[in-house]
Amino acid sequence: MGLSDGEWQLVLNVWGKVEADIPGHGQEVLIRLFKGHPETLEKFDKFKHLKSEDEMKASEDLKKHGATVLTALGGILKKKGHHEAEIKPLAQSHATKHKIPVKYLEFISECIIQVLHSKHPGDFGADAQGAMNKALELFRKDMASNYKELGFQG
């Protein structure tokens, strides 16, 4: 399940492109998530009122939250699989406070892949997509494992 050094390099190379515009990427990821999986919007009290894509694009709070999500994910990816210290508090809050099911982590992972592919096609070919899929799968697996320890069946 682990990634090779070369795969991690592919992940981190494209992540460098994300970091050039974290708020823009984060906003686009969340908009794709909410439009493609409207049920996920119910977990976000401060975004529930946003019905149209235009309203979502105009929301500074949504942009800020997108930046928070991708900043946290970037910190995890940079650990190259040695991310237990970063995952534990994230799993704790997502299991006990926010009650975010693992399925929703799958949904947002798909959205991240889609956004990277649309924004960076030259830097996100099949090899990079495969590596990012593996990295996000590792993240989800470790989140799910922590959820289980916390007794959350999400």
From Swiss-Prot:
Localization per Swiss-Prot or TrEMBL: Cytoplasm, Sarcoplasm
Reaction it catalyzes: Fe(III)-heme b-[protein] + nitric oxide + H2O = Fe(II)-heme b-[protein] + nitrite + 2 H(+); H2O2 + AH2 = A + 2 H2O
Record protein name field: Myoglobin
Annotated positions binding O2: 65
Residues found modified as Phosphoserine: 4
Domain of life: Eukaryota
Family per similarity comment: Belongs to the globin family.
